[in-house]
Amino acid sequence: MLGSSKLREVCDQVGYMAHPSLLYDEMSGMENLRYFAKLYGISGDERCAQAIRAVALDPALTRPVGQYSQGMRQRMSLARALLHDPKILLLDEPFSNVDVRSAREMVGLLAKMRDAGKTIFVVTHQAGLLEGAADEFVWMEAGLIVRRTGEFVPMDSPAGEGARLHTGEASR
């Protein structure tokens, strides 16, 4: 078991984007970011501004988050996860409830972050959106890894789940 100081070190390196998003609807986007920045011990608006730029949002963010589109909410949630400049991102369903254009824009942002050296883990039911942007795909079933590949192959394709079942190739 990690000691509390080691655990804090690990946590400081991880950014988490929850599903559903952990944002306060009555607060503006900037107020949300300032609030969460304080929880990380970050003062001033510079890190908030950097997080906003990283997800390509309007820097003003004066409207209450409750008035944002789903795409903007997801970007805000990602900005929140980036506040402390983590090395690792854990993203839970980042494309849920967003239109295809917004999802593709987010994939582009994630690819830029990956290229900048961040390690990104995405949990999604829309893995096809990450085709060409992910280094590895891992499929899980009942908590077990059932497939790993360097490219996206739908589980119901000839090289997907059916092939695994017929050939007995499982990582269980």
Identify the residue ranges that each predicted region occupies.
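Conserved ABC ATPase "signature" region
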Residues: R34, D45-A60
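Hydrophobic anchor residue at the start of the ABC signature
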Residues: L78
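Conserved catalytic motifs of ABC-family nucleotide-binding domains
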Residues: D85
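Catalytic Walker B motif of ABC-type/P-loop ATPase nucleotide-binding domains
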Residues: L89-D92
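Helix N-cap at the start of a conserved alpha-helix in ABC-type nucleotide-binding domains
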Residues: V100-S102
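H-loop/switch region of ABC-family ATPase nucleotide-binding domains
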Residues: T124-H125
